[in-house]
């Protein structure tokens, strides 16, 4: 059950990222990056659904399923509830192409009903048009007479269909994709280079049409090629030297100072997903979201978390346009009880409006600290010397006189030490007697140990050796690994006579045993 819940959360996270990406790039002209990322996210959703996340009827009623339903209706370019197709453009055609490609190859557990705009569980894995043809062939083959006739016909006309079959797939591949040239598949590097050339030339429609090539490529490779470009803003696509490079679970963004305000406003779409019943799990400030999950419950949650992440880490140079927007957020963060004081100290540095003011604030803070220290020192000196302030010259003499008396107490201390050294013999005896009395209390603990040791049964070592290896007598002449039942023998072994007997009688036998 835990695995299914984690997979559901992963689906929800992917859907929220797609929603954010859509809302952030409404006004962008180049849609190629958007389409590529949506294709990758769609593939991950499909793989997770195929692995068994949506395998019961109850799973089709959750928020992840509803968002997946809306996403598929958008991908199939149909208006919700009407079944009418939208006007075609490059974006919808590309999305439709991706969805059809995925639906034909990997979409096995969910299908789309275009008329009702519903996603229903399907027991059929392949397209319904292909299945009846295969069934007819299977029913026609078992007969003995029928297969012979078509085989002869195919032999007579075998050259033409074979050539057609060889030519048709090559033509389809050349029309729909660039994955093969002259019947040979391209490598991933060649595919990436080809689509990158299409985007640089401005043929976005062709690049979008080839986006299914990227379905087997990791998102990190896409980041390097398309999303993160050196010295260019990911939003306005203008060159700029000073950029803020921020990474996320989905994408990495270079933000210029002019666009950061608009970028933050677009990130409010993150809350749209929350209002639709989706709980945000990951964002590109993952550590702050996990550490402070219950900070905010209003619409500015992600906005404040974003600024909190940047302020605490100190990885942002604040532009002039966002000072007014940032001030209430900083005030709110400082008033929050769940934020650590160390983090609040870092946030307080951003309260001044300019860098000069920050320097002044830091310098004034140091000056204030020095003044406070000097004032405290003056107060201490005043409290120490209020009485001698009446006379000017004598206090110095009195101080000198006062410095002499500390010297005589030193011999006094020595005399006391000598007295103590002379009289250590008698008093410590009483102290030792007092200390010895509680030490007697340790005897019951020894008794307890003896009692606990008495519970152990004797170990029969004879079971651990073979008969040939068993020594019969030890150094003292007593048997090893054997305890006699007679009390007399036990007493002899335990008593002092056993040693004498061993010296006189049994030592010869003992030495013969080893010889």
Curated annotation (Swiss-Prot):
Segments of this protein annotated with the region Disordered: 117-188, 362-453, 496-515
Bias type Basic and acidic residues, positions: 370-380, 388-402, 428-438
Biased composition (Acidic residues): 502-515
The name this protein goes by in its record: Uncharacterized protein ORF53
């Amino acid at each position: 059950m835990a695995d299914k819940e984690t997979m559901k959360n992963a689906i929800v996270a992917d859907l929220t990222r797609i929603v954010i990406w859509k809302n952030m790039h409404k006004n962008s002209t180049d849609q190629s990056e958007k389409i590529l990322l949506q294709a990758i996210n769609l593939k991950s959703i499909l793989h997770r659904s195929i692995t068994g996340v949506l395998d019961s009827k109850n799973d089709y009623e959750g928020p992840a399923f509803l968002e997946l339903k809306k996403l598929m209706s958008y991908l199939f370019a149909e208006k919700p509830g009407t079944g009418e197709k939208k006007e075609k453009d490059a974006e919808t055609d590309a999305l439709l192409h991706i969805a059809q490609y995925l639906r034909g190859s990997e979409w096995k557990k969910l299908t789309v009903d275009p008329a009702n705009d519903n996603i229903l569980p399907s027991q059929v894995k392949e397209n319904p048009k292909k299945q009846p043809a295969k069934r007819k062939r299977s029913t026609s083959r078992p007969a003995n007479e029928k297969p012979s006739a078509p085989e002869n016909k195919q032999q007579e006309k075998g050259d033409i269909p074979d050539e057609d079959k060889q030519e048709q797939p090559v033509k389809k591949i050349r029309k729909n994709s660039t994955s093969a040239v002259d019947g040979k598949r391209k490598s991933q590097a060649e595919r990436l280079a080809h689509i990158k050339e299409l985007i640089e030339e401005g043929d976005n429609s062709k690049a979008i049409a080839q986006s299914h090539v990227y379905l087997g490529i990791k998102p990190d490779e896409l980041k390097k090629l398309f999303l993160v470009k050196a010295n260019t803003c990911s939003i306005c696509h203008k060159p700029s030297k000073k950029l803020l490079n921020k990474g996320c679970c989905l994408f990495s963004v270079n933000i210029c100072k002019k666009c950061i305000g608009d970028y933050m406003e677009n990130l409010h779409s993150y809350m749209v997903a929350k209002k639709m019943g989706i709980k945000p799990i990951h964002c590109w400030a993952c550590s702050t979201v996990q550490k402070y999950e219950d900070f905010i419950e209003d619409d500015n949650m992600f906005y404040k978390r974003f600024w909190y992440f940047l302020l605490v880490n100190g990885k942002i140079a604040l532009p002039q346009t966002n000072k007014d927007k940032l001030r209430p957020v900083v005030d709110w963060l400082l008033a929050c009880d769940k934020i650590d004081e160390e983090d609040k100290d870092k946030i307080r540095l951003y309260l001044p409006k300019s860098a000069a003011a920050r320097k002044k604030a830091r310098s004034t803070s140091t000056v204030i600290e020095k003044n406070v220290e000097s004032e405290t020192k003056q107060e201490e000196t005043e409290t120490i010397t209020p009485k001698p302030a009446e006379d000017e010259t004598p206090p110095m003499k009195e101080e000198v006189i006062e410095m002499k008396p500390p010297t005589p107490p030193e011999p006094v201390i020595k005399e006391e030490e000598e007295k103590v050294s002379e009289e250590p013999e008698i008093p410590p005896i009483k102290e030792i007697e007092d200390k010895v009395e509680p030490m007697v209390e340790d005897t019951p603990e020894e008794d307890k140990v003896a009692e606990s040791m008495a519970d152990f049964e004797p170990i029969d070592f004879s079971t651990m050796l073979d008969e040939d290896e068993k020594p019969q007598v030890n150094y003292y002449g007593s048997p090893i690994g054997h305890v006699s039942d007679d009390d007399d023998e036990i007493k002899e072994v335990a008593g002092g006579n056993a040693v004498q007997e061993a010296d006189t009688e049994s030592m010869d036998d003992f030495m013969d045993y080893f010889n």
